[in-house]
């Protein structure tokens, strides 16, 4: 994990154990005493400055503003000891295929609160390269960071090709792997594979019911695919079919947002790339190549149990998953069953009453253990841990007192006096806020149903001592590609509402006393970083640069402009081209931003 720093800047220093080491600090020359009494400084005006507790009591993890002072006569503002985290973003070389459009580089990640970016020499249209400059300025337009990177535009030969050979054996099962060899071409020579051995099977849940199947690849030895994740190697990779999403870029859009939010800390979001897939010599369409959701030193960095290790002090990857009972190891957290989730409205006599919050029932949820398990003790251990973290959260927002977990994962009285300090000592709240922000933007229909990941590591070398949320996944039914009333439209709050498959963790977060002020800060940083604009630019680039590949895909599958079970909205019937589907998505995202700008202004 990055070096951490506990900085006691007035009441902002709330033992934020998730704070990253700041790499640059900008302080004013004026000197103020760090208490709540009246301050004065002739450097701004002759009036008295009063410590603004409303501005400072709302904790912010992304960037510490320092203490804010406001003149109670003229309204002038003063920040003392502001510090900026310059580790949450990057400005790196980027290659584009020639598509006739201008291309620019942007800083990728979270630009510190209050900072702005100015670019120089940052536009290229024709084949060639150019070095661009990005300058980051603070609120006083003082330079705090300078980065350079190159734009490359190269000849457009379409998507990379992945060629899979199973010796003509069919790939039809989720349970049974089929031996294969895999080759890649139409890519940089250093990324070419020639008959790499391994296995392949189908994957997915609802997506398995479609004609175009998604796949999981498992190489015999660790292998990199097409340079993803900085060239890191792993055995397991996935090919997402994107059959239910006629834009075929919703997962790529969510991955862009997730990488911008998570991948400059020790959290994780999959890398990705659109590719053409050939199976036994036959074209099988456009897929998105992505990384398997797993414990790995270059993916989710938890210390998974070694083979036959039955100890409990290991790392655990957990998925909130309504189909968890289909997994080898799973457990439930919470009370009561929402029988409306089942066909026919339910059965049996489960009389257990669910917990309630603001009059809303928080029904029991199932969780699958996605890391290797070698004893029932391990399952019991992580179940007890997650159950008590959940109830510490619930009790805090329900008004039942503040609790933390002891060394035996039992609930005990919190040593802290605030909700934030208490919850942040057992949950990485920064990770929860970032996941909340991503799902709030995308309106993912399955946010409380499945493909929702969290992890914790009890080993001595753990990077995740607290419960951490991350590894966002599965967004084909999101961002307007859903026929339910709560997900189809681009307006209104989503994760804080008790609608559809709502997520109990997000619902509880939205009821904390620090949520409103803190989320506005995260949203402000997200907005200022122009992350959504980058995701929209990516969607448009894919549509233009790979136009011929998408045309070929729809010639193969002929599902454009048709309704795919189970959520496709009627507007999909109007799509005459792949570009139509992309235009609908980018307009929805733009409108979503306008709505959230008003809600969280």
Task: Tell what function each PLM region has.
Residues 261-276, 444:
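Short, well-structured beta-strand/strand-turn elements
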Residues 82-111:
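Solvent-exposed, low-complexity, repeat-rich "mucin-like" stalks and linkers
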Residues 32-87, 128:
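Thrombospondin type-1
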Residues 91, 147, 153-253:
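Conserved NTP-binding catalytic cores of kinases and kinase-like/nucleotidyltransferase enzymes
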Residues 49-70, 111-153:
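Serine/threonine-rich, repeat-prone extracellular segments and beta-strand-based repeat modules
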């Amino acid at each position: 994990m990055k070096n951490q720093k506990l900085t006691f800047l007035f009441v902002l220093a709330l033992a934020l154990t998730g704070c990253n080491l700041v790499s640059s600090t900008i302080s004013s020359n004026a000197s103020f005493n760090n208490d709540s009494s009246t301050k004065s400084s002739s450097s701004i005006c002759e009036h008295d400055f009063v410590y603004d507790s409303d501005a400072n009591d709302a904790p912010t993890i992304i960037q510490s503003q320092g203490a804010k002072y406001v003149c109670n006569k003229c309204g002038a503002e003063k920040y003392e000891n502001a510090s900026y985290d310059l580790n949450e973003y990057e400005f790196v070389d980027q290659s584009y295929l020639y598509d006739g459009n201008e291309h620019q580089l942007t800083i990728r990640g979270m630009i510190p609160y209050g900072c702005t970016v100015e670019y120089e020499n940052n536009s290229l249209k024709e084949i060639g390269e150019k070095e661009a400059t990005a300058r980051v300025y603070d609120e006083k337009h003082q330079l705090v960071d300078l980065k350079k990177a190159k734009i490359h535009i190269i000849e457009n030969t379409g998507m990379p090709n992945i060629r899979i050979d199973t010796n003509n054996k069919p790939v039809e099962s989720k349970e049974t792997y089929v031996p294969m060899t895999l080759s890649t071409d139409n890519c940089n020579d250093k990324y070419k594979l020639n008959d790499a051995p391994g296995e392949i099977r189908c994957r997915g849940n609802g997506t398995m019911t479609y004609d175009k199947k998604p796949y999981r690849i498992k190489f015999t030895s660790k292998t990199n695919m097409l340079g993803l994740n900085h060239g890191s190697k792993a055995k397991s990779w996935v090919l997402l079919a994107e059959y239910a999403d006629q834009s075929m870029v919703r997962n790529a859009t969510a991955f862009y947002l997730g990488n911008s939010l998570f991948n400059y800390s020790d959290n994780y979001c999959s890398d990705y790339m659109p590719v053409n897939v050939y199976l036994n010599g036959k074209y099988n369409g456009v897929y998105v190549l992505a990384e398997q959701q797993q414990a790995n030193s270059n993916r989710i960095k938890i210390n998974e149990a070694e083979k036959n290790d039955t100890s409990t002090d290991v790392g655990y990857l957990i998925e909130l998953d309504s189909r968890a009972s289909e997994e080898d190891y799973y457990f439930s957290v919470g009370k009561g069953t929402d029988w409306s989730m089942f066909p026919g409205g339910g059965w049996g006599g489960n009389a257990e009453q669910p917990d309630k919050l603001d009059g809303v029932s928080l029904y029991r949820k199932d969780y699958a253990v996605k890391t290797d398990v070698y004893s029932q003790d391990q399952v019991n251990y992580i179940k007890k841990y997650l159950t008590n973290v959940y109830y510490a959260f619930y009790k805090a927002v329900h008004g039942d007192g503040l609790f933390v977990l002891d060394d035996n994962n039992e609930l005990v009285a919190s040593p802290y006096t605030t909700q934030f300090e208490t919850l942040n000592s057992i949950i990485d709240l920064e990770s929860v806020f970032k996941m909340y922000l991503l799902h709030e933007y995308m309106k993912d229909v399955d946010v409380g149903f499945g493909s929702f990941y969290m992890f914790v590591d009890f080993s001595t070398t753990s990077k995740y001592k607290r419960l951490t949320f991350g590894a966002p996944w599965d967004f084909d039914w999101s961002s307007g590609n859903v026929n339910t009333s709560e997900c189809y439209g681009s307006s209104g709050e989503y994760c804080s509402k008790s609608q559809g498959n709502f997520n109990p963790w997000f619902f509880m977060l939205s009821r904390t006393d620090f949520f409103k002020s803190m989320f506005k800060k995260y949203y402000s940083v997200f907005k200022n970083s122009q992350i959504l604009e980058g995701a929209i630019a990516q969607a448009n680039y894919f549509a233009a640069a790979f136009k011929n590949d998408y045309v070929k895909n729809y010639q193969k599958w002929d599902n454009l402009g048709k309704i795919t079970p189970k959520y496709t909205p009627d507007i999909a019937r109007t799509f005459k081209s792949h570009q139509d589907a992309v235009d609908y998505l980018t307009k929805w995202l733009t409108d979503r931003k306008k709505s959230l700008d008003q809600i969280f202004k």
